[in-house]
Structure formats: structure tokens, C-alpha cells
């Protein structure tokens, strides 16, 4: 009898196409939830608590699907499913804040693939910071932010801020000021009506 481990499961091209299609469905619903802090028109009758509960249920279902893929195939990188689809694994982990053990599992397996050039270094940096913040520790790459009353993105607690841009460049991340301004612009556009009512007519960018 020959025993085959989960990680050595043969990855046929047809099977990987099915996985890629399923991952794309996961990405679409993940982003729908992640980009709507308040109930969108389709869910306009939902109070905010019910909408948040719905989002949590979506994230949990997505997480379970990704875990099933990990158990069956191991971490799927560029070589297996291409860059776009592989990025979705980290995306799902990023939004699984209520299951830090799952985030840590993805982080560990992602690092192995990054070292093999089979996954994006920036994905590792984003998830590393997320796990640190969720563990009440300092982040290292300044990917995780909050917003002040003016709508400006501000890094959450950060270790060694002096050398931050050097670390970000090493992990294929844009310079911090450019990143914060990008997030500030996006935040303003997503909440434009709110800011206009407060007399803020444009995003407050860092100079």
C-alpha cells in the first residue's frame, strides 16, 4: 500500500482551474464585504450590527474553504494557480481576524513560498503585521492603519519607525507616505458624503 500525504496530492491542470474559479468567487464576495463598512443598497434594511454579523459569516465560510484547500494541496503559489489566484489566499486570511490561528497558519506557509519566490513578499508583510496587531504587538511594515478625525491614515503601533521605508522596500511595498496618502484618498472617496457634511471637501494628504 502506498500512502500519499495531503501536501503531495497531484495538482492536475483541470483541478487547478476549478480551484482558481472558486477562489475568484471567494475574492468577489470578500471584497464586497470588505469595501462596505456600512450596509450597501442590497442590504439597506440591515442595522449595522446585522451587517457586521453577515460579513463575519462570509469571512468564516471563506476561511473554511481555504483551509480545505490547504489540507488537500498545501499552500498554492504562483506555480500552481498564478499570481492573481494565489493572492486570494492571503486576502482571506487578512479578513479572518476572529481566527488568529488560521492567520498564523497561512503566514507560516506563505513565508515558505515567499522564500521560494512562489508568492509575493508584500503579502507576507501585510499578513505579518495583521497577526502582530491582532496579538496586541507592534507591527513591522506599517501596513495596518487607523484614521484620525480628518480622515488621514495613521499606522497603528509600529516598531522601529525610523527604518520603516527600508523594510517596506525590501518587501516590495511603496514608501510609507505614498501608501498613507493612497489610503487616505480611498477612505475619503468611500466616505465622501460623511466628510462633505463635516466641511472636509478633499482628502487631507501628507506633504
Task: Describe these PLM feature segments.
Residues 1-16, 207:
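Bacterial Sec-dependent N-terminal signal peptides
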Residues 6-8, 88, 186:
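Short secondary-structure boundary/hinge segments and terminal tails
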Residues 10-135, 142:
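N-terminal helix-rich structural modules
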Residues 46, 90, 147-148, 159:
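General secondary-structure edge motif
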Residues 123-132, 159, 195, 200, ...:
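Alpha-helical solenoid repeat scaffolds
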Residues 140, 146-150:
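Polybasic, proline/glycine-rich intrinsically disordered low-complexity segments
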Residues 163-207:
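A cross-kingdom marker for long, charged
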